[in-house]
Amino acid sequence: MNHVGRDWYMRGHQASARYAEDVNEFEELGLTPIYRCGFEAPAVEEAPVRLGLERVDEWRIPQNECRFVVGQIRWVEFPESALAQDGYLDLEGLGVVALSSLDGYHVTQKLSRLAYAKPEQSVADSQPDFMKGWQDA
């Protein structure tokens, strides 16, 4: 699984097309396949965040004839510079896009990070510095 970058989201969308079995969509779209951790399926080298997902289970949904696939993440790759000390990953800084439905692509805008919500507080504390994190606050 790959996070799609803002500068190549149109090619990322086109990769979802049902190409003939003998057509290499990486070649068709000018994307670069890379292989990691013994996985048969390639990741996209241009993606700033890549995840190796192993299929664990699958259920057929009779109401719409779709399949619900359950996977387990086996490996993750991203630039170390995007990782804060407390584990926050700066996706917006990596230039990835968000997807809604099957065809809606969006850019995001950071608002703030909020403290862990607790019943005894009325509103969570805000941390505007996304990379600073809560352990440094």
Regions found by a protein language model. Give the residues of each.
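Basic, polyanion-binding surface patches
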Residues: M1-A137
